Amino acid sequence: KNLQNEKKAKEYLGKIQSSSNLLLMIINQILEMARIESGTAVLQLKAEDIDALFHRVNTVFEEDIRKKNLQYHADLDVRHHYVVCDQTKLQEIMLNIISNAIKYTPEGHSIHVKVHEAVSENPSRIRYIFSCEDTGIGMSEEYLPHVYEEFSREHTTTENKVPGTGLGLSIIKSMIELMGGSIQVESRQGIGTKFTVDFSFDIASKEEVYGNQ
């Protein structure tokens, strides 16, 4: 009966598509975690332009930022712009952390994303510090020790309304460690959250990224 109503039919199809996308995401996350835990995950390293990568990451969320009227600031402050990294995994790490900030930051609030270069003890390598700080709902002191556990989510009224599996940060932490990096989180409930990731990469040249064009 309801299928005769076009609006209702579109609503049902939308729910089916959302459920299918969520299921596919869960399957992919479980497979990725299995690869990491079994030691079969490998890094696909190549020369990359960090300016271009950072721009791609930030443009992904333009529509979500507009819809929630968020004050979104993205800053890149590096001297070395070309590095050897796993582009896909580095993007996924940034996308996941920024996506969480957007999901848990109320309308009209702010998010500040930054990549800056830190001092490296190895002259052939550079350190990038990626940070994402929001004025969102934050996390309780009791939950923070469990933030990277598989299938872990804080049970609050707001948290329960946001779709997710609780696998994301667990996988992201494993990816970061696979890349030789580290991640830290600071959070206060009702005030906001800040994730900080410390990466180290081999330095590349512009020619390695773009050839002789």
Which role does the model predict for each range below?
Residues 18-23:
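Short alpha-helical segment of the dimerization/phosphotransfer core of two-component systems
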Residues 34-45:
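Helix-loop junction within the histidine kinase core
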Residues 101-102:
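Short helix-loop "hinge" at the ATP-lid/N-box region of the Bergerat-fold HATPase_c
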Residues 163, 168, 172:
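Short alpha-helical Gxxx[C/S/T] motif in the catalytic ATP-binding
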